[in-house]
Amino acid sequence: MGPVVERPAEPGTSSAAELELLKRRAAERIDEAAERLGALSRAIWSAPELAYEEHRAHGELTRFFECEPPAASWAVQPHFGLPTAFRAEWAPPESAAGPRALQVAFLCEYDALPALGHACGHNLIAEVGVAAALGLRAALESIAAPPPVKVIVLGTPAEEDGGGKIDLIEAGAFENLDVVFMAHPSQENAAYLPDVAEHDVTVKYYGKASHAAAYPWEGVNALDAAVLAYTNLSVLRQQMKPTWRVHGIIKNGGVKPNIIPSYSELVYYFRAPSMKELQVLTKKAEDCFRAAALATGCTVDIESEAHDYYNVIPNKTLCSAYTENGKKLGMEFISEDAVLNGPSGSTDFGNVSFVVPGIHPYFYIGTDALNHTEQYTEAAGSQAAQLYTLRTAKALAMTALDVIFKPALLEGVRKEFKCKLQEEQLLNTAA
């Protein structure tokens, strides 16, 4: 994956006072649409769908843009690259938008978790993306001669499993985008968190069934291999870096106690701060899996998922602009020390951050409940979350306006993106 082709960093200019008026108009438009936006979020929340199966959410989101007045003002492409992805685009008719137009994109997620529903608040991610796009459009519409800009919303399914954004990158959906924005619900406000790289595997052991009481010596125990593998990885933790994470389950351990299991299956996730470190960790783990097969006489298949999630490359220039706008709206952000020493996860936005500069902040939704719990599911569907969600959308829209009307900021965003991408490439190719 390579970076996008850039256009000149001069889409528009505006005085500080004029820019503040545009930001105010963006916030006003989001408030005006609050009821519709909340209804959209609740519709997605009330009918949770798993990765690549978000058909109802896809329909709700595309209909929202198709029905946004005036009629047909958004160019909507359903099933964009994936059955449950979409693209909505708007450009000021007076701006002579063309190939040189600055393309600003807001990303929506809307897949849920098995059994828990929207325990990661992806309904709120979708709402933030839609709301920010509406706010930015309203601000640009208030200008007599708006600059050449395209406002794009990308519906990106399957973040929880599979990596829909990676599919869309491969399909060309991120080509020619200049800056991308999205925001993720959490327990605090942070312009970024150190999201790490992730590699997932399914490990299958094949043995030989036998009667466990009458002639166990005739069997080859695949469950023993799974247990040994689990133990091997537990011992490996002594030599793991503090920033590495390994977690897994035994998905299949046999069918009946008096039958020597002929098959077992584990699923493991490996995480590390960089793709380079992730490769080292993965090699160590695979050695553990193969050693368990050797010790038990089983055969083993190690199947990697189709996509690895890259670590997120933060753009501090963009983060600073977002933080400034957020503080004006009353957001309180955690400290840099808390960011660096706090919890982290993985996201397919990491892969996006290697292709186009962007921002992936986290936002408080009025609860201390942790993501991926029943309590967070409840909070993500609550009315209390709406204030914080729409406030975040306003901050994103305001930051997008900064990018559009401050050429020096856009140039800084691009320069930092290039430098950090080169650093990552050097890190990942170093011996």
Swiss-Prot record:
Organism of origin: Mus musculus
UniProt xrefs under InterPro entries: Amidohydrolase, Bact_exopeptidase_dim_dom, Peptidase_M20, Peptidase_M20/M20A_hydrolases, Peptidase_M20_dimer, Xaa-Arg_dipeptidase
Pfam families: M20_dimer, Peptidase_M20
Protein keywords: Carboxypeptidase, Hydrolase, Protease
Regions crossing the membrane: none
GO terms assigned for molecular function: carboxypeptidase activity; dipeptidase activity; identical protein binding
Similarity-based family: Belongs to the peptidase M20A family.
Coiled-coil spans in chain: none
GO terms under biological process: proteolysis; regulation of protein metabolic process
Tree of life domain: Eukaryota
EC number: 3.4.13.4
Name of the gene this protein is made from: Pm20d2
Biological role stated in the UniProt entry: Catalyzes the peptide bond hydrolysis in dipeptides having basic amino acids lysine, ornithine or arginine at C-terminus. Postulated to function in a metabolite repair mechanism by eliminating alternate dipeptide by-products formed during carnosine synthesis.
Protein name as catalogued: Xaa-Arg dipeptidase
